[in-house]
């Protein structure tokens, strides 16, 4: 997959551009599938699960799904880094991750976490071994190194 063939990707997007619907917020993406305005969507699993709970006739497709990277950090020079790290450890604990999943529909990052979720949320769990093997590989180093050129190419395509 890497290095990305950006011209080829943008050429493919150009071939279907008239059929694309762009969204700017997670709420808007969820509304698009709830109101049956789109046949397929890329959106966060928690938003998709909420839409299905609200009656949207959608199901997840896990073939080369794209995980989203997130970070939690303690800034250099923080007044109380020990407390900050303690908060992060608490947040990432199995019990707290289970509660977070139950409240938000987003999968836990702690593999020891065992949230109590219904069948709809289980469909959208991104942390199962089967889902992990089917994901699209994200090379954060590549994205960091090529960030400016990738953003420029995509922005120019959007504007054109």
Positions of the model-derived regions?
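Non-transmembrane alpha-helical segments in soluble domains
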Residues: 10-14, 30, 34, 42, ...
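Ligand-binding pocket segment of bilobal, Venus flytrap-like solute-binding proteins
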Residues: 1-61
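Conserved C-terminal helix/tail region of periplasmic/extracytoplasmic solute-binding proteins
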Residues: 31, 130-160
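Soluble non-cytosolic domains of exported or imported proteins
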Residues: 3-7, 24, 78-82, 94, ...
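Mature extracytoplasmic/periplasmic domains
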Residues: 75-135
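Sec/Tat-exported extracytoplasmic proteins
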Residues: 16-20, 24, 37, 52, ...
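Periplasmic-binding protein-like
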Residues: 11-15, 55-78, 114, 120-121
